[in-house]
Amino acid sequence: MSQVNMRDMLKAGVHFGHQTRYWNPKMGKYIFGARNKIHIVNLEKTLPMFNDALSFVERLAQGKNKILFVGTKRSAGKIVAEQAARCGSPYVDHRWLGGMLTNYKTIRASIKRLRDLETQAEDGTFAKLTKKEALMRSRDLEKLDRSLGGIKDMGGLPDALFVIDVDHERIAITEANKLGIPVIGVVDTNSSPEGVDYIIPGNDDAIRAIELYMTSMADAVIRGRNNVAGGTEVYAEEAAAPAAE
């Protein structure tokens, strides 16, 4: 079973919250105190909650369920994309498009357009077009890939969301709540834990903290998949295969 320890969290700075004047009273029970006007998260509370979330993700992965990783702010995007790709999971790292879950039918049509453009780019169709038309399609492809590239192989709605910074990704959480999709979220001292089923109280800004959350979650997915698929490679191949639209 995937586990993190106190040392890992201290090293990553998970305990450093936001300035005390920005605190959200709903996070009060997870705050240990303050130092230099910065709230300190009580890691003795975070530890079991983090590990509960990891166990939940591992169980989901064992049942071949899909976990969608969401982190669109600058400090999170690259790490989210790298770790999601490592464990063969869908992700959103650039911008959450309204309706990504609640209007999935429209999103599915955009994914089909993305796939069509990818095919055209590979089979030489672009080369046969006028320079202007080829440039327009290339830009369209780039834009769609940036927004939807991480979910193009998802093949349907996810079974859970893992979110870095619940305030920044509030639209995603609201959509998941409407559809009854469980939400796992990193919740800092200035944020509201509302709508989050598995709360991980902690720093949602520091790169090292984000790396710890994402690496641990990706490891949990891989561990769960290995229990049924016999290896990460098997799952990575499954995830890379184009989903039926």
UniProtKB/Swiss-Prot annotation:
Keywords, ordered alphabetically: Ribonucleoprotein, Ribosomal protein
Matching InterPro entries: Ribosomal_uS2, Ribosomal_uS2_bac/mit/plastid, Ribosomal_uS2_CS, Ribosomal_uS2_flav_dom_sf
GO biological process, one term: translation
Gene Ontology molecular function, alphabetical: structural constituent of ribosome
Annotated Gene3D superfamilies: Glucose-6-phosphate isomerase like protein, domain 1, Helix hairpin bin
Matching SUPFAM superfamilies: Ribosomal protein S2
GO cellular component, one term: cytosolic small ribosomal subunit
Domain of life: Bacteria
Similarity comment: Belongs to the universal ribosomal protein uS2 family.
Official protein name in the record: Small ribosomal subunit protein uS2
